[in-house]
Regions:
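ATP-dependent adenylation/nucleotidyltransferase module used to activate substrates
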Residues: 2-205, 228-240, 317
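Flexible helical/loop "lid" subdomain adjacent to adenine-nucleotide binding pockets
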Residues: 45, 53, 63, 185-189, ...
């Protein structure tokens, strides 16, 4: 009943909650605001700026490297960081990284959008492929691995390789921070996944905040400036701004029902009656981080005998074990 009442109230609302001049096009259910196009766009950009400021994600002297896939999130991130960089006195130029996984009928189309966007924004772009790094495309890796009993979802292999490439390239480009397009929905999903798998040590790391390791210089700092914006709002923003992006999901994600997909469905069901649920999860993760910080203090890691990267055991790291 309450939900229907809320919809009715929105349909009868004749003005934007912020400017009070124009008819609204969007009802932000978690705040109760009805927003016109311009106020909605402005609110998204303000949230990004406020998130960066509140959580100390970036500094004026940072050399920012942006991971860009060509999807709605990374395009939104790149566009907004470019605007911020242009308004920041003496700011270093942005650089972007995009990765060609070698997925048939997917990677090349997506990369064309990335190249076009970076050219329009005058952002340096570095493209590297899985094949350059591993001698194989993701299609080839999956074809080999799925013959073994130990086969895991393609996403596991892809994520491991991408993390390494992004980190290595960002350092190669002399970046001080790697900015990625993880949104509030992504952060909430990951938090729930870590709870479900009892990975409290990962929550304790505080990966959603900028945090440098005192024990290794192998990793570049990572930040998520979109982490306070729900996925559906980013989709609306990028369409209202008419920013070109690649919409189709990765074919492997569609073919393989990974747990993350089920968690997303669960979250979307909860949001129907509790639109603030993702914000509650975000705030809860920060509170739990402060509690777990003492228990899971950073300890001296082992190092992979092959690549020298930190690893939890004396054996090869996950990347080198692929």
């Amino acid at each position: 009943m309450k939900e229907n009442k809320g919809r009715k109230a929105f349909s009868e609302q004749g003005e934007c909650s912020l400017c009070h001049n124009i008819k609204p096009i969007y009802n932000r259910r978690h705040s109760g605001q009805n927003l016109c196009k311009d106020c909605f766009i402005s609110s998204i950009e303000k949230i990004i700026n406020k998130t960066i400021s509140k959580y100390d994600l970036l500094t004026p002297i940072d050399k920012i490297v942006v991971g860009v896939s060509g999807g709605k999130d990374s395009i939104t991130l790149l566009y907004n960081l470019k605007q911020i960089q242009e308004k920041t006195y003496n700011a270093k130029p942005l650089s972007a990284i995009s990765i060609d996984e070698g997925i048939e009928n997917y990677s090349s189309t997506r990369l064309n959008i990335v190249k076009e966007t970076c050219k329009e924004l005058n952002v340096e772009l570095k493209v590297v492929s899985f094949k350059e790094y591993t001698t194989k495309t993701l299609d080839q890796i999956v074809a080999i691995q799925e013959k073994h009993e130990s086969f895991r979802y393609p996403c596991n292999y892809c994520a491991t390789i991408k993390r390494r490439i992004l980190n290595d390239l960002a350092k190669e480009l002399e970046g001080t921070v790697l900015a990625l397009g993880h949104n509030l929905t992504d952060v909430s999903e990951t938090y729930l996944m870590n709870i479900l798998y009892n990975r409290l040590h990962l929550i304790a790391r505080g990966n959603i905040l900028r945090k440098s390791s005192n024990l290794t210089d192998k990793y570049i700092d990572r930040v998520f400036p979109l982490m306070k914006i729900p996925e559906h709002e980013i989709e609306l923003y990028v369409n209202l701004k008419k920013l070109k992006y690649y919409g189709p999901l990765c074919p492997f994600r569609k073919e393989h029902p990974i747990l993350r997909k089920r968690v997303l469905h669960f979250l979307n069901e909860l949001k129907k009656t509790s639109p603030e649920i993702e914000f509650n999860l975000f705030n809860g993760s920060l509170e739990l981080l402060s509690v777990l910080g003492e228990k899971y203090k950073e300890t001296a890691p082992h190092y992979c005998p092959k690549c020298g990267y930190p690893t939890p055991s004396p054996t090869k790291c996950r990347y080198c074990s692929l």
